[in-house]
Swiss-Prot record:
Principal place of residence: other
UniProt similarity note: Belongs to the TMP family.
GO cellular component entries: trichocyst
Subcellular location: Trichocyst
Name this polypeptide is given: Trichocyst matrix protein T4-C
Length: 27
């Protein structure tokens, strides 16, 4: 459903933000 798709998009955004934070921590 639409709600599930939105949750997936939010999860993708969250994972991308987490990845950016991890990269920043390494620097």
């Amino acid at each position: 459903g639409a709600v599930g798709e939105i949750q997936i998009l939010l999860n993708n955004i969250a994972s991308q933000l987490n990845g950016d934070q991890k990269k920043a921590d390494k620097v």
